[in-house]
């Protein structure tokens, strides 16, 4: 478990992180989102012990990061955006070197390295120089070093940046596999990745925690209204007449041109996020207007992110 209480980080007169609090539990993958300059990187550096907070407290399984840093850091595995690799070492040499730095007992070192290689599927590359590895496998080696010692908390900063689509899928699957045994914090600018991989999402803006919850919870909270795309066989006056009696509808737009199948493309905007597809279908059926298709446009995590950061983006701080 990692907990932050009223964390503040200032650089001179500039406040990068402003009274940030959170409590993260093992067994979940947390997505950490924020626009450039939101204070995200500064917060992650404090979580991992690279920076000390100006005030406030960060504890790892009850150990204070400032008062007992060695014990607190022993629970953390960290993959920075650019993995700290040595190109002239083989994969195995590098992992054994990191295992020694982490003070893993020499008798356990070989088994720990083998376990990390197995989890990240790099065992067949153990004798290869790191300089000869692809970007995807370099990321795997970086993740393997984070897993050495089986730390309870895994912190990943932009783990799929620069990877090709197949490599991205492989790394995401690997991250998902860590969930049962670890607490995983994933920082990413790729909102679809966070939505797909993470159990909960934290959104930070101007150094403050603006939202935390599951993607579904945040999408429901910020839904506001719903939009429906409907293909209908009929004429514009008939459609508008049928829908005019529904109190939940705010606006109806009808395309000027019919589709190839002769249907009208109708966009319906409602006053709330409540699902009224059944009411729409009944209203159209009551005047014998066939509905070929009806889809509800869902609120996306991207929509939530833009709304949350936009409400705070009023000439505030530029944080790191």
Report each predicted region and the residues it spans.
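ABC transporter nucleotide-binding domains
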Residues: 2-4, 9-211
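Solvent-exposed beta-strand sheet faces enriched in polar/charged residues
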Residues: 5, 231, 255, 295-297
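C-terminal coupling/interaction segments
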Residues: 269-320
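The C-terminal cap of the DNA-recognition helix in HTH/winged-HTH DNA-binding domains
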Residues: 118, 180, 245, 285-286
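A short linear hydrophobic-aromatic micro-motif
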Residues: 121, 250-255, 290-295
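ABC transporter nucleotide-binding domain
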Residues: 173-186, 190-271
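Non-catalytic surface loops within mature trypsin-like serine protease
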Residues: 26, 124, 232-234, 270-272, ...
